[in-house]
Curated annotation (Swiss-Prot):
The protein's name in its UniProt record: Acidic phospholipase A2 1
Keywords: Calcium, Disulfide bond, Hydrolase, Lipid degradation, Lipid metabolism, Metal-binding, Secreted
Lineage of source species: Eukaryota, Metazoa, Chordata, Craniata, Vertebrata
Organism listed in the record: Protobothrops mucrosquamatus
Tissues and organs where the protein is expressed, per its UniProt entry: Expressed by the venom gland.
Assembly: Homodimer.
Amino acid sequence: NLWQFENMIMKVAKKSGILSYSAYGCYCGWGGRGTPKDATDRCCFVHDCCYGKVTGCNPKLGKYTYSSENGDIICGGDGPCKEVCECDRAAAICFRDNLDTYDRKTYWKYPASNCQEDSEPC
């Protein structure tokens, strides 16, 4: 769920998901359309696509189990929400791997009017 995703981002990327990724670019936050603006925004695009493939679990509300070892996330269990955990894990790692190009000044609260192109397919 979103709270678990927030905690996962904190563990892996050492940033607050809410304060760093909830309104970034065209895809980080609610909804999304257009072309991802940078590598971080692409992390969110891929995360949205991943959520779109999940069945049997509400990604924003469903709980999953995971543990953290040496900064890595291990998704546990075999329930339907394990897929959500794997989506969240991949996004948190993607955020961490792209911290060097994260551009808050340009893409934080990026206007939706700049995201009007047709979305590329997942």
